[in-house]
Amino acid sequence: MKLKNLMTELVKRNGSDLHLTGDSVPFFRVQGQILPASSEEYLTKDLFLDLEELLGPSKIQIFKEEKELDCSYGLDGIARFRMNIFLDRG
């Protein structure tokens, strides 16, 4: 799963934030600077599939209804992440 790989890499780089937008390259915030995490775009459909797998059906249902979700996710042995997910358009 690309999302878990990005989360792991963020921790390795001592980053504080992971910025994801569908059909765009992902970005890390490291020591206050926004840096590209990859040169490869994270397709919207792949991002949604990864979020569905990561969060599970109940949280995804809340996201679909409210168009936003604040939650946390623990990546075993790596870190706990606070997540703010929202739709910017539509």
Predicted regions located by residue number:
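N-terminal "pre-motor" subdomain/linker immediately upstream of P-loop NTPase catalytic cores
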Residues: M1-G90
